[in-house]
Amino acid sequence: MGALLDILLVNTGDKYPAIFTDNIIHMLEKTGTKYDKIHIITDEQYEGVWNKLQLFRDFKKGPYLYLDLDVCIKGNIEHLQREELHILHAWWRTRHHTPLNSSIMSWSGDYSYYYKVFASNPEYYMLTYQGIDEFIYNLDKVVYKTYNPVCTSFNWHGFDEQWDVILFNQAYHKMTEYGPWSKYMLFDVEPNMDPITK
């Protein structure tokens, strides 16, 4: 049996209240997903999503599984562990500026290449690309692989319960409102309640 996963989360700035990190832990435990430790990056060194690149600077052993905070976990997700760096292929939408989605990533080993390139000229990369997905996709050196479809997007397909993971992404505020996802989450909401904001 291999080593247990370390779960990685990023919660910088004031976009997500602390309950969103607690919610991930709640869903992992509820689904019986086994892990060793949870690491949460809270140091806001850059703007918004660019802080996720700190993951590659700080975590060079593994195995790791990174999750965005705006996901609903319905089933055990240990099967998402990968040795080589894997990023989501956003099969659920048109390509836009990149076909990648970094809401879920897994790896073992040293992928600090991504952080080092970015840190060499962060202002340039933040102005040139809309986020780390486009940044990673456009680098000359390709050192990642993409998952086969392992999740879906609430924004594009609604709350499709056939998947173990549903991404909410820009609709993260819906997670704190009552819906079919509520039974999986920590947010204690009932029909006709106001959304949770703390």
Spans of model-derived segments:
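Short, hydrophobic beta-strand segments that form beta-sheet elements in well-ordered domains
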Residues: K34-T42, P63-D70, E84-H89, Y144, ...
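Catalytic core and acceptor-binding pocket of nucleotide-sugar-dependent glycosyltransferases
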Residues: S108-K198
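Short, polar loop motifs at secondary-structure junctions
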Residues: H39-Q45, L69-E78, N148-T152, Q170
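N-terminal anchoring/stem segment of glycosyltransferases
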Residues: M1-V49, K60, N169-K198
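A structural signal for well-ordered alpha-helical segments within the folded catalytic domains
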Residues: D22, W50, Q54, Q130-N138
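GT-A fold catalytic core of metal-dependent nucleotide-sugar glycosyltransferases
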Residues: G48-P99, S106-W107
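A generic structural signal for well-ordered coil/turn residues at beta-strand boundaries
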Residues: L100-N101, Q162
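A short acidic, often aromatic-flanked loop/helix-cap motif at beta-alpha or helix-coil junctions
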Residues: E44-V49, T94-R95, P149-H157
